[in-house]
Amino acid sequence: APDGGSAAMCYIFDSLQQNFLLNKGDKIVLFAPVFTPYIEIPEQARYLFNVIEIKALKMTKDGYHTWQYQEKDLDVLKDPSVKAAFITNPSNPPSYGLTKALMNRIVEIVRNDNPNLMIITDDVYATFIPHFRSMMAELPKNTLCVYSFSKYFGATGWRLAIIALHQDNIYDRMIRELPRDKQELLKKRYSSLSLHPE
């Protein structure tokens, strides 16, 4: 359990890089609006990711902002050079969840075009949306989920969050498929934590 959602983000970025799943300069997608650390962290010198933003620009005919994404903008996720997508769902600060149509489109793209896409979903505002459904429920093998207790319990001072990952996931598989030299480095790194670090 990390020290709140912000710390969880730092651990996730570091872990993905330290385990050779994201490399400096890799393409990632940020769904905006987004909690600001997701904007700031990728620009730090140790990451310098190539960030592509998908903005929630959809509006109704009478000019009401729906805080949803245009389906055509999701096509950027088809590109296998896009390694990860960071989604704050429900959005922060507007607190709008992804529509079922958008969720279905993301699922379709991952299954048909980019099966190794790592999805990091920040579900901290989930309790504010009736009948909320996380990306983790739709794409459990691809999704890392961040959840913080501060919003639900109104206790921001607690600084307590969780990072959830399905037991059967692409992250472990991609680590197993790394070149032998990188696997050896990881085996050495984790040997103090596990009798079987492989």
Predicted stretch roles:
Residues 123:
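Walker B catalytic acidic pair
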Residues 119-120:
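Residue-level marker for buried hydrophobic side chains located in beta-strands
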Residues 1-114, 126-140, 144:
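Conserved core of the PLP fold type I
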Residues 142-198:
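Conserved core segment of the aminotransferase class I/II
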